[in-house]
């Protein structure tokens, strides 16, 4: 079985973390000779701007469209500043062009050892386990806008259609139904103020009631949800579904609960993973960390993103489970980078996870 994976290493620590994820994927092929990965490296972000003038070259986009999945490192950095052409524009464009409408970001603890690293007390965060499902190609980030043209006025537009909301609701429902019993669904909005949120709430309610009556649906205002995530995060265990901007903010808030951005993976999908072959782009939740010295970045988020890719896009569930178990074992053994109060290097963590994967798959 051969799978084609586009590698978009990006900027600064991006090449370092994708290299460790590739190392772990290659460990799978050594333990499973019938599995083969074809890696094709392409440019995105600042590296692409330097080489081509564009943050997303046509070659990168076309190659990504033909692949089974895309694994991305990180984009951006002070070198490219806030000019007219910015690395982040490449990310927004590839999401839109590949119709990656659903962003999945799990928030949990891969090891009990991580509880004491959370900025919240361990007794508050223990047992936290939810996934944020963020609508990724609609809303205010893609709405009509007007820049300030010297008159001191600028505006952006938040717009959603019923079909866009139905689509992301079905993704959240599908994920909730993967557990037995099904997980509760939490829908976050600002329906007490925004017309777009009132449409959101109405559509989510109707979709769940008509298509997924077995699911428990809870509505929460986004500001209230932000407080709950700090006061009692496990109260929102299950699947959280929300709009593009709210999802951007709430998932970043959630990302600090486990203690480090270097732990958290993400997946952006273009369809339901009902056959475990959905096309997706996978990336860590952290940025490009331009100030970090070489070989110091935590590669676990990217390695876990690769595990999500194995499960959702490449139909390799056993191998995905092995990677996640290997990560837990490595953390338990204290082989962690400085952000987790360890002394191991990027490559040492990658080596340890790869070795554990081979043991588990033998």
From Swiss-Prot:
InterPro entries: IsoCit/isopropylmalate_DH_CS, IsoPropMal-DH-like_dom, Isopropylmalate_DH. Mg(2+) binds at residues 223, 248, 252. It comes from the Eukaryota. Its EC number is 1.1.1.85. The keyword RNA-binding does not apply. Substrate binds at residues 95, 105, 134, 223. GO terms for biological process: L-leucine biosynthetic process. One of its GO terms (cellular component) is cytosol. Belongs to the isocitrate and isopropylmalate dehydrogenases family. This is 3-isopropylmalate dehydrogenase. It comes from Blastobotrys adeninivorans (Yeast). The lineage of its organism: Eukaryota, Fungi, Dikarya, Ascomycota, Saccharomycotina.
